């Protein structure tokens, strides 16, 4: 019977578990894991290569070296399984038990675990309430700690030096006990009564008032409560027994030449054992205390090094002077266990090769080299050979395959038919980086790739390599075919645009074929059908671009949808079109009108065309259509014979005069500068602006010349038509190149940037066609090198950003259909500077409406709440001019531990409502991270040519309507009768006749208004103008200027321009002022009226004070008369640097990391009225009196710019001091919706600048994850501590429980965490540990006895389960459901039998699967 049971033992059932718990192991636990004590430091006998007994590789402890064979060879073979050899003591079993059997070392003296000592904050320190330094002194035998003070005046845990100790012993004798080393600390830990301490701390927390104490107590309470809850004893932080890793995990490999390669751990263990044995011997010999003490200290250090080398003091080094790799180093970092072996594994059945273009493939195919396929599909071929009886054994089959007999090739064809393979191109930045294809066998050694999937893989054929992977199981093949097949992934998940858009030569071919020419051969002919056109074209009667009339048959959707009616019906109509378009109409899918093709097909048009096809005709038709477009494009491009030659680059004749005029203007500015009318900075700004404009002008002239050409029409008159110049066609079609690049070829290269981003003011007036001279070439190398340097740096940064994003969102999965919330956000079109940057339709497409969408004119409901707004809906909404729609958003979704489909809306990569199980978090992270890398790789394409927009200096209306000013707009009328704006946040709206807002423009401070409130204007009317180069300081009151604190050499400096010799007063930076006194004063102006009295602000007793900021150039003199609206000083704006995602990527990172900006603007904490209090040294005091009359004070540094004036009403959350916004303030004062709007808009700004489209919802998903913690403000009756940060879902669960039990729930504030912080503070310790700061995370988790419920994707990958997303979510759900039903059945049976046992069965509280230790 026992043998039978043993047989069962062999097959290890894989454990099913739902959670993993981590904790501290007690000494007994460690002994129970162990299979024996390691007593000797020996490893293996280097003559016999057999492990030494009781050593680190002992076979008696860890198991046999060979399968089923004991060490001495007495028992061999399977029949002795389980026997323990009496001679060598080795159990006869599998050798692989040496990978799992642990040993232990009994330490002669206890040793502190370094992680709990040194990993900050020190847990030992917290529990004992001692400082880390003191504990260290005790542990390393430098001081005594009092354990029992007895009747003496000493205190427990008091530290004393050796000298003190001996004095006290003389004084008190053995009244008290003090110890040294880990024994002492262990005694102290044992003495702690946790329950009592927790009670005391809770009462202290309630009674204490000091912030510092509250913080300290809360921290300590948290740790102690964790001990209390988890049942872990604090003294287990001190080791008495040290576990020994199984030997196969720290191997010792003999090299040839009698040397050994060994894991560093063996060295570290040897040291521990040696010191431990020496200590044992010293203790037996009753050696002097000082020697024993030294040995104990050395043992402590040896164990420290084994656990975490280098954490304390110098790292232990091996023979070759490099630090040894300890246990902690094994798991942390990129090369550690988590990231190297658990999250990224190497897989078999894979190969890689160079890719070449496969233009004859269908979209779902790839060409696989025969030899590769033969190797990859070997097992399948062996199987087939055996089944067919060609080979009798695997060995024979192997031989067949090696000889590559004809039958093998036939079988290979059969095996790979309909067996998809996966292709992957590194770096895999988004999910389209891995797609499945059906292999087609080809000769040669390169993989053939379909040209249309290149965009998704970001692949090109200049030597890129791709990897092939074979899905083996049937399920894997099915998933690859349904989810990953290239023809099922035709949209980008980032923005829902088609990813299979033709590019380069395909675009050129299609464009060339759909252009029209004036007076081409056969113009004006009429044809009865497309076939006739083709015949005429083949017989050279017409050209591709000839204008002709053709009768074209379109297949339109049948209105009659009854049974048996055809889906499409033909519709014939006569079109005026061109030959090329008529020929292309053959491939149009059913359901698309000919009008979509009846225009020149540029890249954008083709993208739109494919998009329309996808929405109207479905996936299959679109894929076929795209394939046919590609074939036609290649064919037509070949036939077109377009080429580039130097003569295509036409330099405009007016170039010289344009450049000459600019040079004259620059001279004029130089002259003005010399005579002191402008500052150096202003001169530089203006010069750069002139050259930008010149560059534009030359470019424009060049494009005008390139883009049209003169022709004679049919009537013999000369007219102009769009040019057939090759270079122009390439750029215009979007095939390659851009207007900027053509301008460098044939216009002028323009301004160049230095590596720091500032612009060199002498432009390169030559172009590449004329050639650059040496100086010009030298200037341009600057930018080119910067581009290359940037690329290298930014790729790494972008990859790290993606990694952080993935980590923070990896556990966000769609888990239910609808959470039923009624919250959402109001979406409006995004308008900047009067331009609609993003239309409303784009922002609400694919979202679910949360309130009914109502027709503004008839007030009838168009779409009920809960409708998914698709293309037709958003077009209708746009047509009716609805300007705001409330939609669901991931931010307000009420699903716990996930998202619901309705709040997320459309899955952009599939074009329909998102499926339950979709890992939307990872998709969001990829969508934001992928372009980051793309962009950073693209900085250098403009060759550093400074692409800087000329600065806006006016604003004009885009539409007809009525001007309205917002409530914040304030202006004064100056002596000339001009209206000067003195508000900083004023906006001008333009409304149509029924009062709907059409556009809105910010009007800056100091602008001159040209239109007033209520004026009716036409489109194109200027509303306001201003000087973009300087910021003025304007007075709102008239009077005589009286300077205060304007002392030369103290607060202001006389700047004498070295060129002009004229002087101006400039306010000096506070840091550069000499004396302490001058740092606190602020140069300012008061105004005196005719009687010499100070002018007061109307309605108050405060005198008008106008302060000058640092850097201001004061333009008035002391005692000068000024009028209302006059400029007192100017602040020159910084010279602008070129914008480029180089600045952009760090910006995105700092937004997602929620960093508070330096010198952040200050927001009003309450709604109320402002007034200025008494200024303190260096600060001015702003007071806001709220509606109840309470005063809130803000102290503001004097050099800051205050945006409010006296007695102004401000709203809570309004900016009162200028500066960049702090996201934490926005969340606190304006709420989640405002915060999300801020982050989304800011992130989108960066990407939009690069022309990258990302859907808002991806950014919202990330923001949701940044908001997943809350801070408890009042704990009610819950288990939380005030001030503690907890997971939102946890807190809501706990509150639900409290409400159900009729107790008081906790109240909380939202907290915004940066993505790194949010990843580390996740509930899953496995996920956090594999991200960053592994040691700290694991230490904390172990003390808390944390339990990881394996909710996210990462944790599950690490423990090797199916991830709870996609098909895995369904699997886990089914498993849980089955368990529940099994348990219910079990309970039922138990209940029926309960009366037999006479005991009612306890309900199964715990899940059946205990947490795996």
Curated annotation (Swiss-Prot):
Catalytic activity: RNA(n) + a ribonucleoside 5'-triphosphate = RNA(n+1) + diphosphate
Known cofactor(s): Mg(2+); Zn(2+)
Species of the source: Burkholderia vietnamiensis (strain G4 / LMG 22486)
Chain positions recorded as Mg(2+) binding sites: 460, 462, 464
GO BP, one annotated term: DNA-templated transcription
Pfam families: RNA_pol_Rpb1_1 (PF04997), RNA_pol_Rpb1_2 (PF00623), RNA_pol_Rpb1_3 (PF04983), RNA_pol_Rpb1_4 (PF05000), RNA_pol_Rpb1_5 (PF04998)
Assembly and binders: The RNAP catalytic core consists of 2 alpha, 1 beta, 1 beta' and 1 omega subunit. When a sigma factor is associated with the core the holoenzyme is formed, which can initiate transcription.
Protein name, as recorded: DNA-directed RNA polymerase subunit beta'
A molecular-function term among this protein's GO annotations: DNA binding
Family: Belongs to the RNA polymerase beta' chain family.
HAMAP family assigned to the protein according to its UniProt record, in alphabetical order: RNApol_bact_RpoC
Keyword annotations from UniProtKB, A to Z: DNA-directed RNA polymerase, Magnesium, Metal-binding, Nucleotidyltransferase, Transcription, Transferase, Zinc
Physiological role: DNA-dependent RNA polymerase catalyzes the transcription of DNA into RNA using the four ribonucleoside triphosphates as substrates.
Positions with a binding annotation for Zn(2+) 1: 70, 72, 85, 88
E.C. number: 2.7.7.6
Coiled-coil annotated residue ranges, if any: none
Residues annotated as binding Zn(2+) 2: 819, 893, 900, 903
Entry's cofactor comment: Binds 1 Mg(2+) ion per subunit. Binds 2 Zn(2+) ions per subunit.
GO cellular component: DNA-directed RNA polymerase complex
């Amino acid at each position: 019977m026992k043998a039978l049971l043993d047989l069962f033992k062999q097959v290890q059932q894989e454990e099913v578990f739902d959670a993993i718990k981590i904790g501290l192991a007690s000494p007994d636990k460690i002994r129970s894991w162990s299979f024996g004590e390691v007593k000797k430091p020996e490893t293996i006998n280097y003559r016999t290569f057999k492990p030494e007994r009781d050593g680190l590789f002992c076979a008696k402890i860890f198991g046999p070296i060979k399968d089923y064979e004991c060490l001495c060879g007495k028992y061999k073979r399977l029949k002795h399984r389980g026997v323990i050899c009496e001679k060598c003591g080795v159990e006869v079993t599998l050798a692989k038990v040496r990978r799992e059997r642990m040993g232990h070392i009994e330490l002669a003296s206890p040793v502190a675990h370094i992680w709990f000592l040194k990993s900050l904050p020190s847990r030992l320190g917290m529990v004992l309430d001692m400082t880390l330094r003191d504990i260290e002194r005790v542990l390393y035998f430098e001081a005594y700690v009092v354990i029992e003070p007895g009747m003496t005046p000493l205190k427990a845990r008091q530290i004393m030096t050796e000298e003190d100790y001996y004095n006290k012993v003389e004084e008190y004798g053995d009244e008290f006990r003090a110890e040294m080393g880990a024994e002492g600390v262990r005694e102290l830990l044992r003495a702690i009564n946790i329950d009592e301490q927790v009670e005391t701390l809770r009462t202290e927390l309630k009674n204490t008032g000091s912030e510092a104490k509250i913080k300290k107590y809360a921290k300590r309470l948290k740790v102690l409560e964790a001990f209390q809850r988890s049942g872990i004893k604090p003294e287990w932080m001190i080791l008495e027994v040290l576990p020994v890793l199984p030997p196969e995990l720290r191997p010792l490999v003999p090299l040839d030449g009698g040397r050994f390669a060994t894991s560093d751990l063996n060295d570290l263990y040897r040291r521990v054992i040696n010191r431990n044995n020496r200590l044992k011997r010293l203790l037996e010999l009753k050696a002097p205390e000082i020697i024993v003490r030294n040995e104990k200290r050395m043992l402590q250090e040896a164990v420290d090094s084994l656990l975490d080398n280098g954490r304390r003091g110098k790292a232990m080094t091996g023979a070759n002077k490099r630090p040894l790799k300890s246990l902690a180093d094994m798991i942390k970092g990129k090369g550690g266990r988590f990231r190297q072996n658990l999250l990224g594994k190497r897989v078999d059945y894979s190969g890689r090769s160079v890719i070449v273009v496969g233009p004859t493939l269908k979209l779902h195919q790839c060409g696989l080299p025969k030899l590769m396929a033969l190797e990859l599909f070997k097992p399948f071929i062996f199987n087939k050979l055996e089944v067919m009886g060609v080979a009798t054994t695997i060995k024979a089959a192997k031989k067949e395959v090696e000889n590559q007999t004809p039958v093998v090739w036939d079988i290979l064809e059969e095996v790979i038919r309909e067996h998809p393979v996966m292709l992957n191109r590194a770096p895999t930045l988004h999910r389209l980086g891995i797609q499945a294809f059906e292999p087609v066998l080809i000769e040669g050694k390169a993989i053939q790739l379909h040209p249309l999937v290149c965009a998704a893989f970001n692949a090109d054929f200049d030597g890129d390599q791709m990897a092939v992977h074979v899905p083996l199981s049937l399920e894997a093949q099915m998933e690859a075919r349904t989810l990953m097949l290239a023809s099922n992934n035709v949209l980008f998940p980032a923005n829902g645009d088609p990813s299979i858009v033709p590019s380069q030569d395909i675009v050129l071919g299609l464009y060339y074929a759909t252009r029209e020419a004036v007076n081409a051969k056969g113009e004006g002919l009429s044809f009865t059908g497309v076939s006739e056109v083709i015949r005429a074209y083949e017989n050279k009667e017409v050209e591709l671009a000839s204008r002709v009339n053709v009768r074209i048959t379109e297949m339109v959707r049948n209105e009659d949808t009854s049974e048996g009616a055809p889906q499409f019906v033909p519709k014939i109509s006569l079109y005026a079109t061109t030959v090329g378009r008529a020929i292309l109409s053959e491939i149009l899918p059913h359901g698309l009108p000919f009008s979509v093709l009846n225009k020149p097909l540029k890249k954008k048009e083709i993208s739109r065309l494919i998009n329309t096809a996808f929405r109207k005709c479905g996936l299959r038709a679109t894929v076929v259509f795209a394939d046919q477009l590609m074939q036609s494009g290649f064919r037509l491009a070949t036939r077109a014979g377009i080429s580039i030659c130097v003569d295509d680059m036409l330099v405009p004749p007016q170039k010289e005069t344009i450049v000459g005029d600019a040079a004259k203007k620059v001279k004029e500015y130089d002259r003005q500068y010399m005579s002191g009318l402008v500052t150096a900075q202003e001169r530089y700004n203006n010069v750069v602006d002139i050259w930008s404009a010149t560059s534009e002008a030359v470019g424009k002239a060049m494009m005008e010349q390139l883009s049209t050409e003169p022709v004679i029409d049919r009537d013999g008159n000369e007219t102009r038509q769009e040019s057939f110049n090759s270079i122009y066609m390439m750029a215009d079609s979007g095939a390659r190149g851009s207007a900027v690049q053509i301008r460098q070829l044939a216009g002028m290269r323009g301004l160049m940037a230095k590596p720091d981003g500032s612009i060199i003011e002498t432009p390169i007036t030559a172009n590449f066609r004329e050639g650059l001279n040496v100086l010009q070439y030298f200037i341009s190398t600057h930018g080119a090198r910067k581009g290359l340097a940037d690329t290298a740096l930014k790729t790494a940064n972008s990859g790290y950003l993606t990694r952080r994003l993935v980590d923070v969102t990896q556990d966000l999965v769609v888990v239910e259909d609808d959470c039923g919330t009624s919250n959402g956000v109001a979406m409006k079109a995004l308008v900047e500077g009067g331009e609609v940057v993003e239309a409303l339709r784009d922002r609400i497409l694919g979202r679910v409406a949360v309130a009914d969408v109502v027709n503004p004119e008839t007030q009838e409901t168009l779409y009920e709440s809960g409708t998914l707004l698709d293309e037709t809906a958003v077009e209708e909404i746009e047509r009716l001019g609805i300007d705001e729609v409330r939609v669901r958003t991931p931010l307000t979704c009420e699903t716990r531990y996930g998202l619901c489909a309705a709040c997320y809306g459309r899955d952009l990569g599939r074009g329909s409502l998102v499926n339950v199980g979709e890992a939307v978090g990872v998709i969001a992270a990829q969508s934001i991270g992928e372009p980051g890398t793309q962009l950073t790789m693209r900085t250098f394409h403009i060759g550093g040519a400074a692409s800087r927009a000329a600065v806006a200096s006016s604003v004009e209306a885009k539409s007809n309507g009525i001007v309205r000013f917002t409530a914040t707009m304030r202006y004064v009328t100056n002596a000339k009768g001009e209206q000067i704006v003195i508000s900083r946040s004023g906006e001008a709206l333009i409304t149509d006749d029924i009062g709907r807002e059409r556009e809105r423009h910010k009007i800056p401070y100091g602008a001159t208004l040209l239109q007033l409130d209520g004026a009716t204007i036409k489109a194109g009317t200027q509303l306001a103008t201003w000087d973009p180069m300087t910021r003025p300081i304007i007075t709102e009151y008239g009077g005589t200027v009286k300077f205060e604190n304007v002392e030369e050499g103290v607060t202001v400096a006389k700047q004498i321009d070295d060129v002009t010799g004229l002087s101006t007063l400039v306010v000096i930076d506070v840091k550069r002022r000499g004396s302490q006194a001058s740092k606190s004063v602020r140069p300012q102006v008061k105004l005196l009226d005719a009687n010499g009295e100070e002018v007061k602000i109307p309605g108050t007793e405060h005198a008008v004070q106008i302060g000058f900021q640092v850097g201001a150039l004061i333009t008035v003199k002391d005692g000068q008369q000024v009028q209302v609206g006059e400029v007192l000083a100017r602040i020159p704006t910084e010279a602008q640097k070129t914008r480029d995602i180089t600045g952009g990527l760090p910006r995105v990172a700092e937004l997602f990391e929620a960093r508070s900006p330096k010198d952040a603007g200050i927001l009003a904490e309450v709604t109320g009225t402002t007034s200025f209090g008494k200024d303190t040294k260096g600060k001015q005091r702003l007071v806001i009196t709220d509606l109840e009359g309470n005063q809130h004070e803000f102290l503001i540094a004097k050099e800051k710019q205050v945006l409010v004036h006296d007695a102004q009403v401000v709203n809570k959350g309004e900016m009162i001091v200028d500066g960049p916004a702090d996201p934490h303030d926005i969340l606190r004062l304006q709420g989640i919706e405002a915060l999300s709007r801020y982050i989304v808009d800011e992130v989108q700004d960066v990407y939009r600048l690069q022309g990258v489209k990302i859907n808002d919802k991806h950014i919202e998903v990330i923001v949701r994850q940044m908001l997943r913690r809350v801070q408890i403000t009042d704990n009610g009756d819950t288990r939380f501590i005030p001030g503690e940060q907890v997971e939102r879902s946890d807190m809501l669960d706990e509150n639900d429980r409290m409400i159900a039990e009729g107790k008081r729930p906790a109240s909380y504030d939202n907290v915004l965490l940066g993505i790194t912080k949010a990843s580390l503070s996740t509930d899953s310790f496995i996920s956090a540990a594999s991200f960053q700061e592994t040691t700290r995370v694991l230490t904390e988790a172990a003390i808390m006895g944390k339990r990881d419920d394996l909710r996210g994707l990462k944790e599950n990958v690490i423990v090797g389960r199916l991830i709870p997303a996609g098909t895995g979510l369904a699997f886990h759900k089914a498993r849980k459901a089955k368990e529940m039903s099994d348990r219910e059945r079990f309970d039922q049976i138990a209940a029926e039998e309960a009366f037999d046992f006479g005991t009612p069965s306890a309900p199964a509280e715990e899940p059946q699967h205990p947490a795996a230790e």
